[in-house]
Each structure stands twice: as structure tokens, then as C-alpha cells.
Amino acid sequence: MVEYLVILSGMFGLALACFFGLRSIKLI
């Protein structure tokens, strides 16, 4: 169960990083 939460939080973090990365690229 703990491993599942770690993987889930990791995927969520990557999604947020990609989302904000694309937004910053569009702003520039």
C-alpha cells in the first residue's frame, strides 16, 4: 500500500511539473 502511494504521488508530481513547464513555455 505504501509503495502504491509513493508511485501515485510521484506520477502526480510529474504531471504537475509537465503542466507548469508547458504553461511557462507558452508564456515565453
UniProtKB/Swiss-Prot annotation:
Pfam families listed in its UniProt record: PetL
One of the protein's GO biological processes: photosynthesis
Annotated membrane topology: Single-pass membrane protein
Keywords: Cyanelle, Electron transport, Membrane, Photosynthesis, Plastid, Thylakoid, Transmembrane, Transmembrane helix, Transport
Key word Electron transport present: yes
Compartment(s) of residence: Plastid, Cyanelle thylakoid membrane
Gene Ontology cellular-component terms listed: cyanelle thylakoid membrane; cytochrome b6f complex
InterPro entries with a match to the protein in the record: Cyt_b6/f_cplx_su6
Function: Component of the cytochrome b6-f complex, which mediates electron transfer between photosystem II (PSII) and photosystem I (PSI), cyclic electron flow around PSI, and state transitions. PetL is important for photoautotrophic growth as well as for electron transfer efficiency and stability of the cytochrome b6-f complex.
Family under the similarity heading: Belongs to the PetL family.
HAMAP family in UniProt: Cytb6_f_PetL
Subunit structure comment from the entry: The 4 large subunits of the cytochrome b6-f complex are cytochrome b6, subunit IV (17 kDa polypeptide, PetD), cytochrome f and the Rieske protein, while the 4 small subunits are PetG, PetL, PetM and PetN. The complex functions as a dimer.
Protein name (database record): Cytochrome b6-f complex subunit 6
Organism, scientific name: Cyanophora paradoxa
Record lineage: Eukaryota, Glaucocystophyceae, Cyanophoraceae, Cyanophora
